[in-house]
Amino acid sequence: MKRWYHKMVDPIHHLHLQMRLEGREVVDACFIREVEAVPGEEMPLMLIAGLANGNVVAYYDEAVSGDLQEALAASLAGLEFPAIDPLLDVLKTYDVQSEVGHYKTYVFPSIPVKDRGVDCFSKLDKRVRAFGFDGPTEQVYAMEREGKVVSACVSTRENEKCGEAWVFTAPEYRHQGFAQRVVNAWAGSLMNAGKVPFYSHKVENVASAHLAGRLGLLPVFEEIVIIRA
């Protein structure tokens, strides 16, 4: 258990795992390239991450010109994460229009206890399809009330090493702890299979942040993704 826990809280390891989940990999220490087209994901011009151990790391699209990369790296030296205005100023100087996304990612401190009130459904199950929540992976972890699915969690993306949660609860069944239970069931299934379950959200998503707190998750990194507009 100690060995597993130590691996769980290695922030740079988990940052690279999530990058690969999004179809990217690190090359030459500070550059990234797309290795797989993932729906809904755009190749970042630059990615800056504040790690749980206090370090800040940055990666650049390998297609970025050398002079722009050097200017961004020089600006990064005096940056106080998550304030990135100096980087955006550099991009404006180079006439690069950009958009920014800011996200927080967590891992689970231990394998959740099995919850007999949560069932595992096929994404093809008619109750799951009626809920509008089939997702990209086969297994959906859900709770039923009166014969219908009211809360569910599935991997929004998953590979042989990790997965990332996508959770939704019907509005009339919220604030009853259902989301917490289905996320825990989903996470437990991945961890028992030797995979890392990630929970991520945009920093402005207060409801998702509160759910992370109720789940007792460990913040592992916070990232700012800059893409071309």
Model-derived segments and their meaning:
Residues 199-210, 218, 225-227:
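Conserved beta-strand-loop-alpha-helix junction that forms the acyl-donor binding cleft
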Residues 99-108, 218-229:
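Conserved catalytic-core motifs of GNAT/GCN5-like acyltransferases
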Residues 51, 108, 144-146:
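Active-site beta-strand termini and strand-to-loop segments that position acidic
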Residues 1-98, 116, 121-135:
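N-terminal charged segments
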